[in-house]
A protein has these predicted regions:
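Arginine-selective low-complexity/disordered segments
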Residues: 771, 775-776, 781, 785-791, ...
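Carbohydrate-interacting/catalytic domains
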Residues: 1-248, 273, 283-293, 562-565, ...
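Short, flexible loop/turn elements at secondary-structure junctions
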Residues: 67, 147-149, 173, 184, ...
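Short glycine-biased active-site loop of nucleotidyltransferases that positions the nucleotide triphosphate
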Residues: 64-65, 170, 311-316, 360-367, ...
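Substrate-binding/active-site clefts of carbohydrate-active enzymes
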Residues: 213-214, 234-247, 256-448
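Conserved alpha/beta catalytic core and glycan-binding cleft of carbohydrate-active enzymes
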Residues: 415-417, 432-599, 606, 627-684, ...
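Hydrophobic residues within beta-strands of alpha/beta enzymes
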Residues: 50, 153, 301-303, 419, ...
Length: 810
C-alpha cells in the first residue's frame, strides 16, 4: 500500500461506512481532491477487485483494498476533478462497469432546504421520492427522503441484493434530508429505504413520496417516471380556471373503483385466483364509467381514495402511499389516462384525500426513522383510540409540507379537479372520539387543535392562490363555524362543506312511516335555517350504506318495494330541489337492495326488474333537469334563490318552495308530498300570474309511479292562497315530488300602448275640424249676422218712411 494513500485514509470514517452507520458517506466515498492527487474511494461489499477508468483518457488505475469488507481506494495523479467509471469484479466472477453514485453532487439548493424547513416547499415532490433522470451524460434514478433522526439511510432493492451497505445516502446538513443519485437504474425497479435508527437497528420502509407501489400484499415502492404521459385535456383545464363552480351545476357520483364493476378473477395453474385479476384496469374502467356518467347526467365523479393502501377493507382511507395511485387498477400512466379520458368526456374528477390519520403498518409512515416523524410522540395527541390509526403532527413544518404538497401533487400531476378532505372534524378537535384524560388541551386549555386549524388555512390559501379552478371540499360533521368562509375573515377557507346536518335530519325524517311524519315536520324544514351559513354539498354518501345501515332503498318505510321506491323517489327529488350541490353514492341511483360490499361488484342484475331500472331512469331525469334549469344551481348560496311557498302544512306533510334566478321565467315551483294521501284539488299560491307547467312528477309511470300527474298547463287565477294573490289548483299524488316551470303572464309592450294612443288621437283629430276652420266659420257667421242685422235695420227704416208717407196723405 502506498504511504500517501495510507495517510489519506480516515479509518474511523471507513469503519462507519463498513458498518453502515455513516450519516454522510460521501465525506469519504467518491472523488476528493487532495494535495497528493485525486483520491477516489468506493465501498462494494461483494467486490473482489476494483479499478478506476478515466473517461477522458481511458486509462485504468487499480484500486487497493483498504478494508477486507469491500472498501477500496485509489490515488489518481490529478489536481482536479475528473470523470470516471468503476470496473468491478465480484466474488462470483462476474464483472461490470458502473458509474460511481458518489461522484454526483446534490440536487438540492439552499433555497430548497430552507423552504422545506419552513414547510412551504409546495413542489417538494419534484425532489423527494424516486425520479428517473439524466445528470450530465449519466442516466439513472435520483432518490431523496426525509428521516431527521436516522443514523443512516440506504436505498435497497433487487439491484443491490437488498444490501443496506451498498447505497448509503448523503445527509444534507441538519435538514434531515437524505439523497443519492444511482446511475444505471431505470423505471420499474422495486426499492425501499433501509433506515438505521439511533439505536443502530435497521428498518425497511416504503418511500413516503414514492410514485408507484407493488400490488398488495407486497409493499415495496416502484420507480416510475410520471412525466412522460401526453395529456390532451388542456381545453378542460383552461375552461375550469375561468369558471366559478358555485354558479354551475355540480352533481357528483361517488365511486369506489374496485367494486363499481368487477371481473371474474383469473385462475393460475393451481386453480387459485390470480392476485388483482378481479379488477378492471384504470383504462378499461374509464371508458365504461364515463359512458355511464354521461348517460346518467352527472357532472362529476368523486373517487374513494385511490392513493395506495394495503387493506381493501379500509376502502382506501388508511393510506400508506400518499403519492402513488393504487396498483390494484394499473400504473400511474393508466390512472393519468383515466383522468384525461374523463376530462375529454367533460366529466370532472374529485379525489378523496385523507390528511387526518394514517395506519400503523410497519413499512409505512409510523415510527418512520425510529422516532415519531409524522405523528405525535404522546399517544394522547398522536393516536385515534377507536380507529387504531395515528394522527399527524400538524405543527411540524416537514409534516405540513408533506401534506400540502401532496394535495397539490394530485391537482398538478394528475389534473384532479378537486379534493374532498376526509374526517376534518377529527382534525379540528383534540378530544375527538376520546374520553377525559385521553387527550391534551391546547395552550389556552381548549379542545380546538390550533395547529390543525393553521394547517387547513394554509392549505386552502395555497389552493386559492393558484386560481386554477380546483376546489377543496370538507367532510366536517360538526357545527364548526366558518368552514367555507375566507381565511381573511377567520374562516378555514374551504370551497364547499358536506351538509351532514341535512343528511342526518332528512334520513331521520324519511325513515318514519308517513303516518308519523307530521310529528317530525320540523326536521324537513330546519335545514333552511342554516342553509346559507356555509357553501354546502348535499350528500347521500357511502357512509350511509355500510356498517349495518342498509341501502338507501332499505331505509325507506313501506311494506312493499313499490312503496319504498316511491319514498326514495320523493327523497331524491327533494334533495335535487334543495339549495346546494349534490352527491349520491354508486348503486343508490337504481335502488340497490343490499348495503355496499367493497369485495364485490354492485348488484347490476337488479336492473332486470322494472322497479330498479325505472328508479335509475328517474335519477337520470333528475340530473338532466338539474343541468338544464339555472334556478337549480345558479343561486345555491344566495338567499334570493329560494323562497318558501308552503312550510307549515305539517298535517298533510307537504312542503312547497320556489327556486329562482334573476329571471322570472326561469323560476321553478316544487311541491313535495311525504304523506300517503292523494289531494285531487290542492290549492297552491304562486309567485305571479301566468302559466304553470309540470315538467317532472315522481309519480309518473315512466318512473314506476301510478301516473297521477298534472298533464295540462295550469293558468293561475286571482284567488288567494299561501298568502299570495295568485294560485293554481293541482293534483298531488301520495309520496311524490312535482316540479312546475313558471311562465309569467304576457303584458302588451309599452310601445304598442303608445301606438294605440297615437292612433286614437289621430282618429279624434280627423273627426274634429281644426281650430282655424272653426275660427273662419265663426267669423263667417258673425259677418252673416251683421249683414242680417243691417238688412233688418234697413227694413225698419223703410217701413217707418212708408208709415210717415201714409200719414201725410191722411
Amino acid at each position: 500500500m502506498e504511504k500517501n494513500l495510507y495517510d489519506l485514509m480516515d479509518w474511523a470514517g471507513i469503519e462507519e461506512i463498513v458498518y453502515s452507520e455513516a450519516a454522510n458517506p460521501d465525506g469519504l466515498l467518491g472523488p476528493h481532491v487532495t494535495e497528493s492527487g485525486l483520491l477516489i474511494q468506493a465501498y462494494i461489499p461483494t467486490a473482489e477487485k476494483l479499478a478506476v477508468k478515466l473517461k477522458r483518457t481511458g486509462k485504468e488505475y487499480p484500486m487497493e483494498l483498504m478494508d477486507e469488507a469491500g472498501f477500496f481506494a485509489a490515488l489518481i495523479p490529478s489536481k482536479t476533478m475528473a470523470s470516471y467509471s468503476l470496473l468491478v469484479t465480484y466474488d462470483n466472477g462476474m464483472s461490470e462497469e458502473i458509474l460511481d453514485p458518489y461522484s454526483f453532487g446534490s440536487c438540492y439548493t439552499d433555497g430548497d432546504i430552507k423552504k422545506f424547513e419552513s414547510g412551504i416547499h409546495y413542489g417538494i415532490f419534484e425532489k423527494m421520492g424516486a425520479h428517473p433522470m439524466k445528470v450530465g451524460d449519466a442516466e439513472g434514478v435520483y432518490f431523496s427522503v426525509w428521516a431527521p433522526c436516522a443514523m443512516r439511510v440506504s436505498v435497497v432493492g433487487d439491484f443491490n441484493l437488498w444490501d443496506g451497505r451498498r447505497h448509503q445516502m448523503r445527509r444534507l446538513g441538519d435538514s434531515g434530508i437524505f439523497e443519492l443519485f444511482i446511475p444505471g437504474l431505470k423505471a420499474g425497479i422495486i426499492y425501499k429505504y433501509e433506515i438505521k435508527n439511533s439505536n443502530g437497528d435497521p428498518m425497511l420502509k416504503s418511500d413516503p413520496y414514492g410514485n408507484y407501489c407493488e400490488l398488495r400484499p407486497s409493499n415495496a415502492s416502484v420507480v416510475w417516471d410520471i412525466s412522460q404521459f401526453q395529456w390532451s385535456d388542456q381545453e378542460w383545464l383552461e375552461k375550469r380556471a375561468k369558471t366559478n363552480s358555485k354558479e354551475q351545476p355540480v352533481s357528483i357520483y361517488e365511486v369506489h373503483l374496485g367494486s363499481w364493476l368487477r371481473k371474474e378473477a383469473e385462475l393460475d395453474e393451481t386453480g387459485a385466483a390470480v392476485n388483482g385479476s378481479e379488477f378492471y384496469n384504470y383504462r378499461e374502467i374509464a371508458v365504461k364509467l364515463a359512458e355511464y356518467i354521461k348517460d346518467m347526467g352527472y357532472t362529476h365523479i368523486e373517487l374513494l381514495p385511490v392513493m395506495e393502501h394495503p387493506f381493501d377493507g379500509s376502502w382506501g382511507y388508511q393510506v400508506t402511499g400518499y403519492y402513488a395511485p393504487t396498483s390494484r387498477y394499473g400504473t400511474p400512466d393508466d390512472f393519468m389516462f383515466f383522468m384525461d379520458y374523463m376530462h375529454k368526456q367533460e366529466i370532472g374528477v374529485i379525489l378523496d384525500w385523507v390528511p387526518a390519520h394514517f395506519p400503523r403498518d410497519s413499512f409505512g409512515l409510523a415510527d418512520f426513522d425510529g422516532t415519531c416523524v409524522y405523528e405525535h410522540k404522546d399517544p394522547r395527541q398522536g393516536a385515534h383510540p377507536h380507529w387504531g390509526t395515528l394522527i399527524y403532527n400538524y405543527g411540524r413544518p416537514g409534516v405540513r409540507n408533506f401534506l400540502i404538497a401532496n394535495a397539490l401533487f394530485w391537482v398538478e400531476k394528475y389534473h384532479a379537479d378537486g379534493i374532498r378532505m376526509d374526517a376534518v372534524a377529527s382534525m379540528l378537535y383534540l378530544d375527538y372520539g376520546k374520553e377525559l384524560g385521553e387527550w391534551v388541551p391546547n395552550i389556552y386549555g381548549g379542545h380546538e387543535n390550533l395547529e390543525a386549524m393553521d394547517f387547513l388555512k394554509h392549505l386552502n390559501s395555497v389552493f386559492k392562490g393558484r386560481k386554477d379552478g380546483a376546489v377543496v371540499i370538507a367532510e366536517e360533521s360538526t357545527a364548526w363555524p366558518k368552514v367555507t368562509a375566507d381565511v381573511r375573515e377567520d374562516g378555514l377557507g374551504f370551497d364547499y362543506k358536506w351538509n351532514m346536518g341535512w343528511m342526518n335530519d332528512f334520513i331521520d325524517y324519511i325513515h318514519y312511516d308517513p303516518y308519523f311524519r307530521k310529528h317530525h315536520y320540523g326536521e324537513l324544514t330546519f335545514s333552511m335555517l342554516y342553509a346559507y351559513s356555509e357553501d354546502f354539498v348535499l350528500v347521500f354518501s357511502h357512509d350511509e350504506v355500510v356498517h349495518g345501515k342498509g341501502s338507501m332503498l332499505g331505509k325507506m318505510p313501506g311494506d312493499t318495494l313499490e312503496a319504498k321506491a316511491a319514498n326514495l323517489r320523493a327523497a331524491y327529488g327533494f334533495m335535487m330541489g334543495h339549495p346546494g350541490k349534490k352527491l349520491l353514492f354508486m348503486g343508490q341511483e337504481f335502488g340497490q337492495l343490499h348495503e355496499w360490499d367493497e369485495n364485490k361488484s354492485l348488484d347490476w342484475e337488479v336492473l332486470e326488474h322494472p322497479l330498479h331500472s325505472l328508479t335509475k331512469d328517474y335519477v337520470k331525469a333528475l340530473n338532466h333537469l338539474y343541468k338544464s334549469q339555472p334556478a337549480l344551481y345558479q343561486y345555491d348560496y344566495d338567499p334570493d334563490g329560494f323562497e318558501w311557498v308552503e312550510c307549515t302544512d305539517s298535517k298533510d306533510s307537504i312542503v312547497g318552495f320556489l327556486r329562482k334566478t334573476k329571471k322570472n321565467e326561469e323560476t321553478l315551483l316544487f311541491i313535495c308530498n311525504f304523506d300517503t294521501m292523494t289531494h285531487e284539488k290542492y290549492m297552491v299560491g304562486v309567485p305571479f300570474a301566468g302559466k304553470y307547467k309540470e315538467i317532472l312528477n315522481s309519480d309518473s309511470q315512466a318512473f314506476g309511479g301510478e301516473g297521477r300527474v298534472n298533464s295540462r298547463v295550469k293558468t293561475s287565477k286571482k284567488k288567494e292562497a299561501d298568502e299570495r294573490q295568485d294560485s293554481i289548483e293541482i293534483k298531488v299524488a301520495p309520496l311524490s315530488i312535482m316540479v312546475f316551470s313558471c311562465t309569467p303572464e304576457e303584458e302588451k309592450p309599452a310601445v304598442k300602448k303608445a301606438a294605440v294612443k297615437k292612433a286614437e288621437a289621430e282618429k279624434t283629430k280627423a273627426a274634429r275640424p281644426s281650430v282655424k276652420k272653426l275660427r273662419r266659420k265663426r267669423l263667417k257667421r258673425k259677418k252673416q249676422r251683421q249683414k242680417s242685422l243691417q238688412r233688418k235695420k234697413q227694413r225698419r227704416k223703410s217701413l217707418q218712411r212708408k208709415k210717415q208717407r201714409w200719414k201725410s196723405r191722411q
